[in-house]
Amino acid sequence: METTVPLADPNVSESGKGSRLPVFLRGARAVPFLTVVLAGQLTYSAFEAFKGSLIVPLTETLGIRIDQFGILMGWLGIAMFLYVPGGWINNRFTIRSILCSWCAWRLVTGLILFSIPNLSFDVMIVIAASWGVWDAIGWPAVVNGVAFMSQDADKKGRGLAMGLLESIRRGVEFLMNVVVIGALALWSGHTTTVMRGFAIAYTLVLVPLIFALLRRVPKNAVAGDTAGKGESANVEALKGLVAVLIKPRVWLAGLAGLCVYWCYVNLIYSSAPYLSLVFKASDAVAGAFGIFNTGLLGIISGLVAGVLADYLFKSSTRMMGIALLITAIGTLAVRLLPVGDGMMWPAMILLMVMAFGIFMGKAVLLAPVAELNLPEHVNGSAMAVGSFLAYASI
């Protein structure tokens, strides 16, 4: 049976109740907030989270080649084209119901993928395509849930909420992958067994997560709650999506996110090879730098960006502008850096400056959409449209 903790009235500020913590980290909201954040990471923990340092043992476990793994990731990418229709679904159904359904589908299909040996590659493609469809629905529900849990009359905390979403997700992924890498080092002769075991275990983590979502995440307003007399909830959800699509500020916020995410994609795939090819860094140095520059720095930057957005700049939009400025300065400096002996360390420092700016911007990627103060029953579609624009670079 579902039990939820109701939110306080978002039109009344809770910041004056004797606590310096933002509203989503206090009282009845802290656990629901963390539950939504974990839903945004644990759904990916048994497949997409392995695509970096664990891609080779993952493909061996599935019995596929690297190029076939690329095909699966391509099918996952169809989410890009489905974010806008996913906005209608986010208007029509609650955050809780969407996240529970998303996790349940990942649970069932993930167990099929990793439990059945010699699974047909065609079946894998069908599973990957279904994941892409659900990602277009589920991810906007995650960011909408974060915005929903952090809503307060004084608006303070939304930037930090988005920053923590990024930091917690990166931290959880890093720790879960470290555990797998450690196990692979201990049982190096049983790679596929270890990978299969952890993939199944990480998939089964979704079971308690689903129960937590059902029990802890409150119901948000949806289109059916605001439909006029004689008007269906489906029509109201569609009207809400159209209303979001014609708002220039939603498009501008999404395009700003696109600039940040474009830089992010180039950073994670190019920084380590850049050091190796241009400054002749060893594979060990380039690899270690890549892990730090795109892993640990990302965890730190999310928290820093959230704090700066809320408590210094008073706006996630301003924070994103500052992040893009830092990124531009770092990029220009790297471009002007002469190639030669002894320049590898200056290049690494400048790449870290770039990474810091990029991750600060990525941490508040969709926070400007949350700051538009749209009605609760259409905010899900706004996050979907923002996701469509921000992730268009991939």
Model-derived features: where do they sit?
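Extracytoplasmic gate region of multi-pass secondary transporters
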Residues: 51-55, 177, 247-302, 362
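Central cavity-lining transmembrane alpha-helices of secondary-active solute carriers
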Residues: 71-88, 292-305
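Cytoplasmic membrane-interface "Motif A"-like loop-to-helix N-cap segments
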Residues: 92-103, 310-325
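C-terminal ends and interior cores of transmembrane alpha-helices
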Residues: 104-119, 325-341
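Cytoplasmic helix-loop-helix junction between adjacent transmembrane helices
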Residues: 127-169
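Glycine-rich segments within core transmembrane alpha-helices of 12-TM secondary carriers
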Residues: 159-184, 387-394
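C-terminal membrane-cytosol helix-exit motif in multi-pass small-molecule transporters
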Residues: 181, 203-227
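A late C-terminal transmembrane helix in Major Facilitator Superfamily
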Residues: 373-394
